[in-house]
């Protein structure tokens, strides 16, 4: 499928291309900010500027619910929603520029990897994990403060209240436990350091379950957006709309359950394994403190007691 066909399928209609001066300004500013925020990840400011300045960037009409900016790897282009003020383009471009830095292609120019996400012939693994990690990196570059939010009955604090908030909450938990630096370094350099560290800490089975669950949350959210857009195109409420609304509620319930199950798995798999490796009182105290402060990353809902029960056992 051509890029034009894919854009049309996704409801993206190009209005205009950004001029070279604007693209170069965005490339320069973003390369400076990335290198300043992540000085230890082997990034070179001039190399980044050259790489990012070669991107094409467009203003486009986009359907409701779609991200305000989208990167298309097939033509190395970023598409911005027409409603974004020119002064805000840079903040929205950061996430998409990180995607461009991440991409790994084979000799036939097929995408095989993007950060923490692997593109195989039959399935994509780690899409939700990667999107959340990139968004957390972008939030760090921009300097977004954490705020309290509530989604699908889940209360938590996040530095990404508007984009992938539930996925970001779970990935922030992983960053706290495994290490933010190893997470972000693997994300932007597209390597397995974070994955290997997680497998070493929680087991391969638990890592795959966590990764797949975050993907599932992302896919359910995307399905909700598509259904809402279909409902918006129907003039009169009828049985078909009622079935769509029921499907949305079922998806929301499934997202909540998946989030809680995944959070519980993160807690039990990490802390059970860590507890078994304790050899002295100093290790025990470090374990206790780390478990206690996990509460700062917790998503809570009515009737949720797993973390408190785990802590006092």
Predicted regions and their residues:
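Non-Sec secretion/translocation targeting segments of pathogen effectors
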Residues: 1-2, 134, 312-313
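Pan-zinc metallopeptidase signature
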Residues: 8, 154-312
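Hydrophobic (often cysteine-bearing) scaffold residues that line and stabilize catalytic clefts
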Residues: 19, 23-26, 90, 126, ...
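Short, solvent-exposed secondary-structure capping/transition elements
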Residues: 71-72, 102-112, 142-150, 180-186
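Nucleic-acid nuclease catalytic cores
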Residues: 97, 104-123
